[in-house]
């Protein structure tokens, strides 16, 4: 949607970066709150509320005619996403304690692959149906399928096996006092910034290389496909090989891909580099959830994971999309932007080596 908003709403690249920044700020605020609210209201009710908020956001987007309206929509959609994401992630980990990486990967894969599937569909719908009709279609589908699915969510029944596998759990205040929390928080700020920036940079970067719109969108699709598939692959591998090596290696690859992007590779080579960055971004999401529950327990997982997410919401958006947009407007050169983001991935890989599970 970025090229459409740039053309029709007259927003700059830096303002486009702020769209993601406002979305991430919303995630930073509401991820923690939803993590606490779900214990009182239950998973099904929270997800249903998220679906209604998503539908209302689409209704608002139908009427958006200015950059300010677009930023308000981004904040609302970020809030709505929290009401779906956190309870879904919590309920599957509680139900499948021995395969937390795998089930977390499946949930995250659905979130990630939806972007890969919908990006080319958006382009076709935009061309054939127009912007307003496309929004109305999405609104109807969101309400219909979303409310049906949320009604099927149930609280996992407590078993003796589940009780034996839960282990110790830290409260949010206790988790905040550990170095492990702040290492994970820093990784989310840096690698989160490196990953989310590619969402807004890939298509304009492709166009700057002289690619057509179809090929430029394919760069974004490559990123999104890897972002989705890696969530399942990395989640599964983390159950077998451990969370730290899977995350550390993927972040290292992301850094190398960013450093290589400005070197003028072919279309296929550039697509592969976008794929590598997307793989690391998906790994961050899928493996971080079981990593947090491994370190701090499941009893207060939603609230603690929400606190970790403040790094992504409050800092990653500022360091990544927003500052990248300003840097690009200032220099007009993607090379500096990619070196900047690649450094974040390298630092994140290094930080993983220092992460240790807190002692009970």
Predicted regions mapped to residue ranges:
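Structural signature of the two symmetry-related core transmembrane helices
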Residues: 45-59, 245-259
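Intracellular juxtamembrane helix-capping segments at the cytosolic ends
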Residues: 83-96, 283-296
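Helix-loop-helix hairpin linking two adjacent transmembrane segments in secondary transporters
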Residues: 107-154
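Extracytoplasmic gate region of multi-pass secondary transporters
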Residues: 1-5, 179-236, 320, 324
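A late C-terminal transmembrane helix in Major Facilitator Superfamily
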Residues: 295-331
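Helix-to-loop junctions at the C-terminal end of transmembrane segments
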Residues: 30-43, 231-242, 328-329
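Flexible cytoplasmic inter-helical loops of multi-pass small-molecule transporters
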Residues: 154-170
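Hydrophobic core of transmembrane alpha-helices in multi-pass small-molecule transporters
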Residues: 57, 68-83, 189, 269-283
């Amino acid at each position: 949607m970025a090229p459409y908003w740039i053309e029709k709403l007259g927003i700059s690249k830096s303002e486009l970066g702020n769209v993601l920044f406002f979305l991430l700020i919303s995630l930073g605020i509401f991820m923690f709150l939803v993590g606490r609210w779900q214990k009182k209201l239950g998973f099904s009710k929270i997800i249903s509320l998220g679906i209604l908020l998503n539908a209302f956001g689409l209704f608002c987007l139908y009427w958006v005619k200015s950059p300010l309206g677009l930023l308000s929509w981004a904040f609302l959609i970020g809030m709505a996403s929290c009401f779906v994401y956190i309870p879904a992630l919590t309920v599957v980990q509680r139900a499948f304690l021995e395969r937390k990486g795998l089930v977390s990967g499946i949930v995250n894969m659905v979130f990630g692959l939806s972007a890969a599937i919908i990006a080319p569909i958006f382009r076709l719908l935009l061309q054939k149906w127009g912007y307003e009709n496309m929004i109305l279609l999405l609104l109807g589908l969101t309400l219909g399928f979303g409310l049906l699915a949320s009604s099927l969510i149930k609280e996992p029944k407590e078993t003796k096996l589940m009780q034996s596998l839960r282990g110790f759990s830290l409260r949010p205040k206790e988790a905040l006092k550990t170095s492990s929390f702040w290492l994970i928080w820093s990784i989310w700020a840096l690698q989160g910034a490196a990953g989310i920036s590619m969402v807004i940079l890939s298509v304009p970067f492709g166009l700057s290389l002289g690619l057509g719109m179809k090929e430029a969108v394919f760069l974004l699709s490559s990123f999104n496909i890897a972002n989705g598939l890696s969530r399942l692959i990395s989640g599964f591998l983390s159950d077998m090989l451990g969370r730290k090596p899977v995350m550390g290696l993927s972040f290292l690859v992301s850094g190398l891909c960013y450093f290589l992007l400005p070197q003028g590779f072919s279309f296929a080579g550039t697509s592969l580099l976008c794929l590598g960055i997307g793989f690391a971004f998906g790994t961050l999401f899928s493996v971080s959830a079981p990593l947090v529950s491994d370190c701090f327990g499941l009893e207060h997982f939603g609230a603690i994971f929400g606190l970790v997410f403040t790094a992504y919401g409050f800092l990653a958006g500022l360091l990544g999309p927003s500052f990248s947009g300003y840097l690009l407007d200032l220099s007009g050169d993607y090379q500096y932007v990619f070196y900047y983001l690649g450094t974040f991935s390298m630092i994140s890989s290094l930080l993983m080596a220092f992460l240790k599970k807190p002692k009970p």
